[in-house]
Amino acid sequence: MRKLSLLVLLFACFTFAADKPASPELSKQGYEQFKSLQGDWIGTSTKGWKEEIRFNVIAAGSAVEERSFDAHPGETMLTIVHLDGERLMLTHYCAAKNQPRLLATTISPDGKTFEFTFLDATNLPSRDKGHMDKAVYRFIDENHFTTKWTWYENGQEKWLEEIQMERMPVKAAK
């Protein structure tokens, strides 16, 4: 009986530790980093496709909208990054017709790498149905960053791809 209790306790510790949000200070600093992305970007995937992305700071500065125009043929996808109190979160509005919410669980001390992990979702009857489960943003400089997205289905990570992003030059007004 003691062994079973110990196993349950250890499992609970590891389960809850994985869902712990990043520190409030790093989350707030990180949100400012996402706000700095405002503008147009071009991305190249490790699978060879290209996409255009537009970042906008919206809702009186309370959210950052990431609009992907070409990641999925004929579909625009949307990701919203925001603070929920002291937690940094994102919601991904996917062509898979679900909306996973991911929590920033790890932010590097230098504030350049953000790992978001699955928290919950709408329109996802079971976690085993296909959805975006993890996202990692790595900021290189003010004009370059990468993202890695992980697809999860039937209890397994199905694929991971990285997208190299580069800020597009600002077009002069005519």
Show where each model-derived region lies.
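Sec-dependent N-terminal signal peptides
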Residues: 4-13
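Hydrophobic small-molecule pocket/channel-lining residues, especially in calycin-type beta-barrels
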Residues: 19-174
